[in-house]
């Protein structure tokens, strides 16, 4: 069932309910006395108990109000019975709402709310869609980096910086002083050739092996023992050298005497 057919079906029911309500209120107002119309009507919360005795007029007014309330409830039940189950839920939720009796009230009234027309529904849907689009755009802008600020920053950095002659001279002077200080610090940070002169001399006296590596104490001792040779006593080696030299010197004289003896024979 379309929305137009539903509205057309509900319209006569609502008009009947409004007419019943208007007739009941008019009869209740006509029956009241002029002296009691200005006073507010008070009704206890418990409808079953008898009201407190405040006069016969007050009792009659409360009975009329109760009769009006019961009549409104009966008309509402009659309308609900004439509808289908699906239409009853729609009608009770969106079209009819009744006010229950309270401690302080003047009269009973039924508040009927009609469903909004189609053009209002379309406007509400458009507003909801626009709100959703705005929320999505806000989230997108928060997640994305600020590209415009980056572009502006690069453009400002690329622009030339104009100065006068005095400012240019001071800029050059500061740059020269900064370069001089950095060079001085760089030289002071360089490693010296040696920590102290005594250590340098000691390193120069130490024996070195292959590749300029310093030899350990065990390596130095092994090298000295290899140089000394097979004999451990240096005196014996010196005497052996003397004996060998004497033998070499006497050999030419012995050969000459042996040759002379051969000639004589």
Swiss-Prot record:
The record's keywords, sorted A to Z, are: Acetylation, Activator, DNA-binding, Nucleus, Phosphoprotein, Transcription, Transcription regulation
Q: Where is this region: Disordered?
A: 1-64, 78-129, 220-265
Q: Which domain of life is it from?
A: Eukaryota
User: Where does it mainly reside?
Assistant: nucleus
Query: In its UniProt record, which GO terms are filed under biological process?
Result: positive regulation of transcription by RNA polymerase II; regulation of carbohydrate metabolic process; regulation of cellular respiration; regulation of DNA-templated transcription; regulation of transcription by RNA polymerase II
Which PROSITE patterns does the entry link to? NFYA_HAP2_1, NFYA_HAP2_2
Per the record's keyword annotation, is Flavoprotein included, yes or no?
no
Q: Which Pfam families match?
A: CBFB_NFYA
Q: Where is the signal peptide?
A: none
Q: At which positions is motif Subunit association domain (SAD)? A: 162-185
**Which ranges of the sequence are annotated as binding DNA?**
192-217
Phosphoserine PTM sites in chain numbering: 52
Per UniProt, subunit arrangement is: Component of the CCAT-binding factor (CBF or HAP complex II), which consists of one copy each of HAP2, HAP3, HAP4 and HAP5. The assembly of the HAP2-HAP3-HAP5 heteromer (HAP complex I) occurs in a one-step pathway and its binding to DNA is a prerequisite for the association of HAP4.
The record's comment on protein family reads: Belongs to the NFYA/HAP2 subunit family.
Give the protein name, as stated in the record: Transcriptional activator HAP2
Q: Source gene?
A: HAP2
């Amino acid at each position: 069932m379309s929305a137009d057919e539903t509205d057309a079906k509900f319209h006569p029911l609502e008009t009947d309910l409004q007419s019943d309500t208007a007739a009941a209120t008019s009869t209740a107002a006509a029956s009241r006395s002029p002296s009691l119309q200005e006073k507010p009507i008070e009704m206890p919360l418990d409808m079953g108990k008898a009201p407190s005795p405040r006069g016969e007029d007050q009792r009659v007014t409360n009975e009329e109000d109760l009769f009006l309330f019961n009549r409104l409830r009966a008309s509402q039940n009659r309308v609900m019975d004439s509808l289908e189950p699906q239409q009853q839920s729609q009608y009770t939720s969106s079209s009819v709402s009744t006010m229950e009796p309270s401690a302080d009230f003047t009269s009973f009234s039924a508040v009927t709310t009609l469903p909004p027309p189609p053009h209002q529904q379309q406007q509400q849907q458009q507003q909801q869609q626009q709100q959703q689009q705005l929320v999505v755009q806000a989230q997108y802008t928060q997640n994305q980096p600020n590209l415009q600020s980056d572009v502006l920053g690069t453009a400002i950095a690329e622009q030339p910086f104009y100065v006068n002659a005095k400012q240019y001279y001071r800029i050059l002077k500061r740059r020269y002083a900064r370069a001089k200080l950095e060079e001085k610090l760089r030289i002071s940070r360089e490693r010296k050739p040696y920590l102290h002169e005594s250590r340098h001399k000691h390193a120069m006296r130490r024996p070195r092996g292959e590749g300029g590596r310093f030899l350990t104490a065990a390596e130095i001792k092994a090298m000295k023992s290899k140089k000394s040779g097979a004999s451990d006593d240096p005196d014996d080696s010196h005497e052996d050298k003397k004996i060998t030299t004497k033998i070499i010197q006497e050999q030419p004289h012995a050969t000459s005497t042996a040759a002379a003896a051969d000639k004589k024979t």
